[in-house]
Amino acid sequence: MPMSLRLHNNLTRRVEPFAPLDPSSPTLYVCGPTVYNYAHIGNARGPVVFDVLAALLRRRYGALRYARNITDVDDKINAAAQAQGVPISTITDRFAAIYRQDMAALGVVPPDIEPEATAHIPQIVAMIEQLIASAHAYAAEGHVLFAVASFADYGKLSRRDPDEMLAGARVDVAPYKRDPGDFVLWKPSSDDLPGWDSPWGRGRPGWHIECSAMAATHLGPTIDIHAGGVDLQFPHHENEIAQSECAHGGAVFARFWLHNGMLNFSGAKMSKSLGNIETVHDLIAKHPPEALRYALLSAHYRQPLDWSDGLIEQAKNTLDRLYGTLRDLHDVAASAVIPAPVEAALDDDLNTPQALAEVARIAGEARKANDAADRARLKAELLGAGLALGLLQQEPAAWFSRGADAGDDARIAALVDERSAAKKAKDFARADAIRQQLADEGIVLEDTAQGVRWKRA
């Protein structure tokens, strides 16, 4: 009997069977980073979890169109550039490169499409024009705002009462708004800020419209799955629905909405505003990235995850045992075969804790097995179970010889990329400082026609 993927759809608050609109080309959109600073480990939970989902969809359907955006125009980016006295592109190029390196270190496969907001200004402007033409948006004092009252279903994702939402918005209401709950699609830019010519004057897009336009451009008006952190459910995802469905004649924007829970640190939500973050960049310099990935998958994605050094240590110890089992099976030839119980666990709303329990069970059986056929079967299943979760893909010798500093290569590569971005922006002081930092660590840089290479002295 074919396996059936079931996912918790936050739109309906139910676990439902998933079937794509087009089985030959399922679509997945995940909200990506705003590249103004290092990503913290809480920011990595979604990419890791939805990396497991993307791999599952590819196995099941043979294809996938997966987009995860880069927000490279935002007031936080502007503030960071002004504070550091550097061009905005220096900030966005640097942190986009670091983000990609950090995700690669965690074993996250790049999405098929990684659209950047600044490369989609014409599409954003066109969508805003469509919303104005259909009376769902209006221009006022160089701004364009979405008229929330024009969309009867506003609030259907977050289940918030529209009157309560509007009441909460009545603090310091901008005079150009017709209604306190109306949100910005386009805003004017002063000469010192990034901006583009538009029918409403020089300006830049609001955050919400960027994702709507990029999703429609690359995946069409209706996508199968939209995913992101639960903190984005309102207002970001609610506003995406309103914009997209009004711009496309009422067509459903996303059929399934998946939201991952937050990471807690010492009992409080991990966030930059609270100052209790641990960056991926720092963590992969101190711990094997695979242990961080394991830790992120250790709780069900919809539940909060309590992050601690103890959790990381537990993940390291577990991986020591699993790689030790594979090392003991070094004399057995086997190719990865994903076991049915692991697929069944992932089919059950991405139940990664159950899948990891199956990994432990298989490893336990493998350690006891004496029969050659059983050992080969169990090694194949252990490799396959790891493959489904993005784990156990190193050689055991590599894990044990470099486990303590497995993230170092990714950290060095990120610094090399950061130096290249600094040179491009003519920030030579920063570029020289990075070169010196690497030299102090015994890393030699070689500028070649193909780019910068590095090696240990």
UniProtKB/Swiss-Prot annotation:
Residue ranges of the motif 'HIGH' region: 33-43
Which Pfam families does the record cross-reference, listed alphabetically? DALR_2, tRNA-synt_1e
Motif annotated as 'KMSKS' region, chain positions: 269-273
Q: Where does ATP bind?
A: K272
Q: What is its EC number?
A: 6.1.1.16
List, in alphabetical order, the GO biological process terms annotated in this UniProt record: cysteinyl-tRNA aminoacylation
State how the cofactor is bound.
Binds 1 zinc ion per subunit.
| SMART domains attached to this UniProt entry | DALR_2
Q: Which GO terms describe its cellular component?
A: cytoplasm; cytosol
The UniProt GO MF terms for this protein read: ATP binding; cysteine-tRNA ligase activity; zinc ion binding
Q: Assembly and interactions? A: Monomer.
What is the name attached to this protein's record? Cysteine--tRNA ligase
